[in-house]
Amino acid sequence: MAIKPILFNTEMVRAILDGRKTCTRRLVKPQPDEKHIFPLGFVTDSTEKKEVGCFGFAANEYGGSIQYVKPPYRYAPGDILYVRETWHKYTKRIGKGESCRLAEFYGYKASVANSEDAEEPWHPSIHMPKEAARIWLKVTDVRVERLQEISEDGAVKEGIYVANCKDCNAPFGCDACPDEGYEEIDEFAELWDSTIKKSDIDRYGWDANPWVWVIEFERCEKPEE
């Protein structure tokens, strides 16, 4: 078991806290070239130690040349992840009378109704120290697939929740529109593209159908170290 960080934006943190998000997709970087389109799996043992833990893409279904890609932080089933999220520190007066004192706390944007009212500035998730982590996850599965291979169930595990029909905006369960009025995959596609830089959308956007890491997880307690 290894303990590693993972970054989530504020909306995804809220989905995790609500119990709606149990999976995340991250870009495979670099993407395998056009000649290597057959995923083989993770290398568990090799005479080349640098290949262990990498994912292999073959030139054809029988093998041929192989291109190796290293996963982010080499996430693996059983690993424990601490979530890095948008955060800050703030002070609060506690106690009364002679016992009154100032104490310092960590605050999290995902748990604030109106983050604009915060007196202390928010810090990016990438700068959050491990000691501030409040959400811990256990990796249950890691695999590679094309982005558009995601299923409706997979989109739901990503935290997608369609409350209204996209055709008529009626509450979920209306009978006036066809089933395609509710499309979790469409919502996920929009969410995915919103996270990609405009300069990279042709390479990594939904329509480009890039290879992605699919990391499934469950909530867990902070481990003893």
Regions found by a protein language model. Give the residues of each.
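Secondary-structure transition motif
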Residues: M1-E225
